Amino acid sequence: MATATSKAKPSDRIKMRIRKGDTVQVIAGKDKGKTGEVLRTLPNENRLIVEGVNMRTRHEKPTQEGETGRIVNEEASLHASNVMLYSTAKKVASRVEIVVEKDGSKKRKLKKTGEVLD
């Protein structure tokens, strides 16, 4: 099994249908029910970073003389299986399906609402 610092093996990777800028809802873990925008995806690790979710506190030492140390709150990554795409219009989380248009282009569509994302 892959750790957070190593890359997932090709057999362990999941299809990430979530992209940067999407709104997602956390469906498992300590932040269950929270929604936020995806800031970054890490497809090699099956993880993503969501704005305002899974916050971690990091302590920084002073780097120069006369400077004081700081406490920084930042988002930690979540596993992609712990989030679902979220419809802001209908206020509901949904699975996503890939729809092939007549011109051959692929679009992402929410299954519950029918909302097309791309």
Swiss-Prot record:
Alphabetically, which GO biological process terms does the record hold? translation
Enumerate the InterPro entries for this protein. Answer: KOW, Rib_uL2_dom2, Ribosomal_uL24, Ribosomal_uL24_CS, Ribosomal_uL24_KOW, Translation_prot_SH3-like_sf
- Is the keyword Ribonucleoprotein in the record? yes
**Keyword terms, alphabetized:** Ribonucleoprotein, Ribosomal protein, RNA-binding, rRNA-binding
Q: Please, which domain of life does this record's source organism belong to?
A: Bacteria
Mention one GO molecular function: structural constituent of ribosome
A Gene Ontology term for the protein's cellular component: ribonucleoprotein complex
What the protein does comes down to: One of two assembly initiator proteins, it binds directly to the 5'-end of the 23S rRNA, where it nucleates assembly of the 50S subunit.
Instruction: Tell me which family the UniProt entry assigns to this protein.
Output: Belongs to the universal ribosomal protein uL24 family.
Q: Summarize subunit and interaction data from the UniProt record for this chain.
A: Part of the 50S ribosomal subunit.
Protein name per Swiss-Prot or TrEMBL: Large ribosomal subunit protein uL24
The organism is Parasynechococcus marenigrum (strain WH8102)
For this protein's source organism, the top of the classification is: Bacteria, Bacillati, Cyanobacteriota, Cyanophyceae, Synechococcales
